[in-house]
């Protein structure tokens, strides 16, 4: 049986991204992504969504999981950039 080590949760990732947005550490890719704006973030979300689909059709479950993690990251970057909170999204689940 494979042992899984939980590194991040959806909530902990959001907290990390929110912190980076507030503190703006030098050289942060997240800060650069936030500064690039909604158009750039939206393009990345579309790109990652396509990669999720391709991975689901043609790649391993590990590759699919990685692509999904990238889609979640970019979606949360957009949320932070737009000032949304997790609760704003949770209301619609």
Swiss-Prot record:
One of its GO terms (molecular function) is phosphoribosyl-ATP diphosphatase activity. InterPro entries: HisE, PRib-ATP_PPHydrolase-like. GO terms for cellular component: cytoplasm. It catalyses: 1-(5-phospho-beta-D-ribosyl)-ATP + H2O = 1-(5-phospho-beta-D-ribosyl)-5'-AMP + diphosphate + H(+). Pathway: Amino-acid biosynthesis; L-histidine biosynthesis; L-histidine from 5-phospho-alpha-D-ribose 1-diphosphate: step 2/9. Keywords: Amino-acid biosynthesis, ATP-binding, Cytoplasm, Histidine biosynthesis, Hydrolase, Nucleotide-binding. One of its GO terms (biological process) is L-histidine biosynthetic process. Disulfide bonds: none annotated. Its EC number is 3.6.1.31. It is an enzyme of class 3 (hydrolase). It is found in: Cytoplasm. Signal peptide: none annotated. Belongs to the PRA-PH family. This is Phosphoribosyl-ATP pyrophosphatase. It comes from Rhodococcus opacus (strain B4).
């Amino acid at each position: 049986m494979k042992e899984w080590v939980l590194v991040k949760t959806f909530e902990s990732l959001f907290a990390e991204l929110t912190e980076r947005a507030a503190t703006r550490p030098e050289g942060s890719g997240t800060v650069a992504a936030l500064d690039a704006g909604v158009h750039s973030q939206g393009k990345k979300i579309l790109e990652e969504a396509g990669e999720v689909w391709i991975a689901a059709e043609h790649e391993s479950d590990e590759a699919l999981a990685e692509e999904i993690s990238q889609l979640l990251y970019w979606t949360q970057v957009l949320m932070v950039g737009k000032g949304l909170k997790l609760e704003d999204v949770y209301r619609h689940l």
